Amino acid sequence: MRGYFVVLEGIDGSGKTTQAKLLAEWFEEQGWDVLLTKEPTDTEFGRLIRELVLKNSIIDGSRISYEAEALLFAADRAEHVKKVILPALEKGKVVICDRYLYSSLAYQWARGLSLEWLMQINSFAPRPDLAILLDLPVKESIRRTKARGNMSEFDKLLELQRKVRMNYLKLAEMFKEMRIVNAMASVEEVHEDIVALVKHELLGL
């Protein structure tokens, strides 16, 4: 039997990593074999993304172009899908991914790139069974990110974060597999809401 593919999305500070871990633990308690993964990955492409994009590195006197950035993320995702996600699903595992296709669409669309083009270069990426958007006001996102001492270039750009959040909400209307969870609630309450979604949408409970 094919496994389930679940993605957690949201702006910085929305609790994706924490909730992905909690959901993985919950599935394991139910007897499932679980693969917890993330994007960018730990592959060579993921390393390039961290060095050239997330650290805002300069190449030949200028920042990497947004088009090149989008293609790097797509290349990393292609490797991830072919070598990690699909093989795990074929083995019947539950794959839980911290960020996926929707991150690329939301962030790079906010950078001014064409949504149609972004979807085209990511057309190889299989849609998950369930994509959970942890929605959070931008001011709370910035507060949480500052509190953990992890301010990146993305986090500093308040207007960008506003655009990204708006884009995520638009994507939730476009993609039938996306569901929104209020990330302002406590960690425990958010986890309970996610489990309720999984039971209803995937397991028919």
From Swiss-Prot:
GO MF term list: ATP binding; dTMP kinase activity
Keywords: ATP-binding, Kinase, Nucleotide biosynthesis, Nucleotide-binding, Transferase
Its EC number(s): 2.7.4.9
Keyword ATP-binding: yes
Annotated binding of ATP, by residue: 10-17
Domain of life: Archaea
SUPFAM superfamilies (UniProt xref): P-loop containing nucleoside triphosphate hydrolases (SSF52540)
Keyword Manganese in record: no
PROSITE patterns: THYMIDYLATE_KINASE
InterPro entries xrefs: P-loop_NTPase (IPR027417), Thymidylate_kin-like_dom (IPR039430), Thymidylate_kin_CS (IPR018095), Thymidylate_kinase (IPR018094)
Catalytic activity: dTMP + ATP = dTDP + ADP
Gene Ontology CC: cytoplasm
Coiled coil: none
GO BP annotations listed: dTDP biosynthetic process; dTTP biosynthetic process; dUDP biosynthetic process
HAMAP family with a match to the protein in the record: Thymidylate_kinase (MF_00165)
Family designation: Belongs to the thymidylate kinase family.
Protein's UniProt name: Probable thymidylate kinase
